[in-house]
Amino acid sequence: MLQSNRLAIYAIGKIKKLWIRDGINQYKKRMPELIINELKTFNLNNLRSNNNIIICLSEEGKQFNSVELCSLLLNFKNKKINFLIGDTDGVSSDIKEKSDLVLSLSPLTFPHELARLILIEQIYRAISISNNSPYHRS
């Protein structure tokens, strides 16, 4: 079973759009253990350990459907899963190279603030799938 206390989102910058912040807060209420940090820069040294997985979001990344994403996250067993979201310019090639996985949410390009909301919804959906909750309808 996938649990939100093993998941964290690290994103560059603050959310300025109120409607996105409200959407994120709705999912945060459902997953209070989920860590969401707004940063100025990424420090991979703090995230890198034997028990951590780093997943960087980029439009060039690998795409999964919701069930496949759930399966992927479940395969990481007891590891802490850290998602990195860049700013308007994305993440650097250095961060992508040092990540365990580069993930794309879609072939479409989204503003970085909206990508956070979509990622949080997909995390909630993955948790729901792993718990056999009726939220996900395939």
Swiss-Prot record:
Q: Which GO terms describe its cellular component?
A: cytoplasm
Assembly notes = Homodimer.
Keywords carried by this UniProt record:
Cytoplasm, Methyltransferase, rRNA processing, S-adenosyl-L-methionine, Transferase
Molecular function GO labels: rRNA (pseudouridine-N3-)-methyltransferase activity
**Localization in the cell:** Cytoplasm
Q: Which organism is it from?
A: Prochlorococcus marinus (strain MIT 9301)
Q: Which reaction does it catalyse?
A: pseudouridine(1915) in 23S rRNA + S-adenosyl-L-methionine = N(3)-methylpseudouridine(1915) in 23S rRNA + S-adenosyl-L-homocysteine + H(+)
Q: Please give the family membership noted in the entry.
A: Belongs to the RNA methyltransferase RlmH family.
Q: Which function does this protein serve?
A: Specifically methylates the pseudouridine at position 1915 (m3Psi1915) in 23S rRNA.
The protein here is known as Ribosomal RNA large subunit methyltransferase H
Q: Which InterPro entries match?
A: Alpha/beta_knot_MTases (IPR029028), RlmH-like (IPR003742), tRNA_m1G_MTases_N (IPR029026)
Q: Does the keyword Nuclease apply?
A: no
Annotated binding of S-adenosyl-L-methionine, by residue: 57, 86, 105-110
| Pfam families reported for this sequence | SPOUT_MTase (PF02590)
- Any idea of its EC number? 2.1.1.177
